[in-house]
Amino acid sequence: MKRHYLWMFAAIMICGATVLTSCSEDDNPSQPEQPENGYSASTQELITLVNSNAQLKSLLEKAIAKGVEINPDRETNPAQTLSEYYDFIEWAAHAMPWSVVTQPEGTDIFTRIDQSLNYFFFINDIPLDELDGQTLYNNSLQYFEPYRTWLKTFAKAWGAYLDTEDSWNQAYYDIVAKEDTFGISKGWYEDASNWKTFNQFFARKLSSPAVRPIASPEDNSVVVSPADACTQGVWQIDEDGYIVQDDEVGVQVKSKKFSSIAELVGPNSQYRDAFNGGTLTHSFLNVYDYHRYHFPMAGKVKEANLIEADYAVGGTITWNPKTKKYDLFCDTPGWQSIETRGCVILDTPDYGVVALLPIGMMPVTSVNWAPEVKVGAEVTKGQELGHFLFGGSDFVILFQSGISFTLKPQLFSHQLMGEELGRLD
């Protein structure tokens, strides 16, 4: 099923160099000028890589050229040459998420961010025949070294900018405050004076636990939503530890490796095989959502690992000529095993061990634990587990064999953290 995810606006960072937008100056009042001595470090690093690697240069030029064939419109596909691509990523490293790609006047922020984000990965996710048969997640440039590593460099550079006070001001606050989807006017969040940077806004705290009541807090058979997020479904895990996928659902992962629960849980976990024959469910956070995640059940922390991996789109991007928009397909699980992520193993009294995996996505891909999350800690349902910084985000829960999980909300419906996600038997 096609899903447009604003949260992916994280990826916008890559998207945005010299693209002129339909936004007013107030939308991005402190737009940085290009340095007098040339490009910034992350852009210059890519230029150096391309100039020293003929294969990389050929692949990047081919991806850009194929993008022009698919969508020649300069307003929605502005980087149509290699030099224009350099300018584009230079701009993106200091751009606000809503000020990158031209959109019709009056377009809401959700769409502006969504399309800007998706655009960058449209180029990076274009299939290239030259990369067939290399056991990559797919045959696109974002998984090809050294471009893959450069994406991490770029993401960290943009994340550093979003941690500066240049990334937040009253004008930016006014932009998000007028959008009902962000919920700023609902009294959910801490005082806005606490936000000095964009990332402080993005990882905003609740004003009180009362604004996110926890369903059946003493009953561990009631699993609550770990975040404000849209439910994506429930999948069985076979006895060999692979996700069972319907061939007719979404875009299928080509290699069985990427459906491996052991790969998802991570190389350093003692519980890599603990979920064979079990169940997987995951929920997707949108960009406007509350980006702190909480324990969906009570228990004891057995492991808490951070797994450094790719800074990739998480799914597949296509251009829809009818709607003139970029579409992201990411419902089908498997891509989570390639993303930078966290994994907490929670030992519950009656339902075995449960794996909790916050999944970071491009571009900043920042997964963070709350200070209290340590091995041996006893935690309560609804207690804060951690937070994402700017970027796309997903949350996966794994249950062991013999534990029956029934999803309560309608598929793809939006839940608030603490609402009932499902029941265990």
Language-model features, listed with the residues they occupy:
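Hydrophobic helical h-region of N-terminal Sec-dependent signal peptides
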Residues: 9-14
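N-terminal leader/targeting segments
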Residues: 3, 15, 112-116
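Contiguous, well-folded functional domains in the mature portion of proteins
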Residues: 34-425
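Bacterial Sec-dependent N-terminal signal peptides
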Residues: 2-5, 16-37
